[in-house]
Amino acid sequence: MALPELKAWSRQIVNASGGQAHGALIEYDARPKIIGGKRCFQLSFVENSRDAAQRWESFLVAESGNEILVEDHAADQAMTLAQWRATRQPMQRTGVR
């Protein structure tokens, strides 16, 4: 996944940890999730260290096409990338705005 947020998060994790942790994209459920009639892969971006993997965000990536949604676990729904960027401002986690 080539989202600029994930690239920036990965760089920040490596820099902040002195190379001891890395960003990783992992599948958290092998079963596709159906959203709006579309089958989606269920992936999470995690901070992966020697001791643990800490989830930063979960994504739903359409099996066909290029749609990417972000899971809002609190509201139990998915939001578009535009909604996610507007409401969660993910680049603020890196100091980039």
Describe the function of each predicted region:
Residues M1-A30:
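Short, non-transmembrane alpha-helical segments in secretory-pathway proteins
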Residues L69-R97:
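C-terminal partner/receptor-binding element of secreted or periplasmic proteins
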Residues G19-E63:
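Exposed beta-strand-loop-beta-strand "reactive/processing" segments of non-cytosolic proteins
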